[in-house]
Amino acid sequence: MVSDFMKGRYNLMKIFVGIDIAKLNHFAAAISSDGEIILEPFKFTNDADGFQLLISKLESFDKNSIIIGLESTAHYGDNLVRYLVTELYQVCVLNPIKTCQMRKNNVRKTKTDKVDTYVIAKTLMMQDNLRFVSFFDLDMMDLKALGRFRQKTIKQRTRLKIQLTTYVDQVFPEIQYFFKSGLHQKAVYALLKEAPSPKEVASMHMTHLANLLKVNSHGHFTKEQAKELRVLAQKSVGANDSAISSQITQTIQQIELLDSQLEKIEAEMTDIMKYNDSVIMTIPGIGYVNGGMILGEIGDIHRFSNPNKLLAFAGLDPSVYQSGNFQAKTTRMSKRGSRVLRYALVNAAWNVVRNNVTFKAYYDAKRAEGRSHYNALGHCAGKLVRVIWKMLTDNVAFNLE
């Protein structure tokens, strides 16, 4: 327990708390700004009881004098960071490169959880211009997680749609001639869930079949077209395989489940974006979801001292090819860095091209040089990165006419 005298003394100086993060148990220690050990390393669990133990150790000191640091390691520290920020502590997430440098300077080449707490605390103490995690940063963490989960969900859905097409080709190949817009629409899913084989479609009552198509296509299909579909079903050469028919029904149910999950994910992203009211939403053609994916991946714009660093982070910078005296004049984008950010930026760039004359002129100029659509779009995405960097850095609205 810290005496009142020592508490008053420590409140006059900064206290640096280093936390070594792990999956189940964390270690923490604290030093003063003159290097004195205030709290010996102690273990606490990665749960509510453990977090309370940490707080109880820090309660003896003035909250405003405490600076808490931890390394950016996977996701194990995310809950602790959220908890501490919510409790209004000053929290700094350190780049492991910084702590690695401090570890190398240690005379004793020892690496344990307890030693690492001091290394992290000393790294905090030696840093200038520390940036603390804010509530905005927590929202960006949420956007990043939601955006990446959205991408995974879309990939899952795409695989299921490919499987569904394969199944339908086997049991009812003629259906593709009737639904010219493709299989993946509400009317087709409604039909195949109820009648996943041509035999079942052919035996459906005409009034019911016509009504099912009409309701699920918002009146697009008529009774005459329903008759055409039934004739196709009667003449189908597809396999009458109950196992495949069952897979068709279940695959559609899985696709629809993923559709509903995507709606919820995008609604959450939209709510976060509306609350934060970022200047990125002033860019014509960028919506809440796409804007949210970009912001979530970028996080703190001040991590990037210039737009070229943001370009490299997105993998939109040109790769360099040089051998001896030869250096390639044209190279492809490096495609390193955040794949999700690169996808979001290229997608956003196409929307901006279609909604802004400056970007449209830039795209047309690249096409006039003989570049392909995707090559020109990559250049537009690079231009968009520079615009976004400037907007977020200076917090100014889009102003390119």
Where is each model-derived feature located?
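A detector of single, family-specific signature residues
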Residues: M1-E401
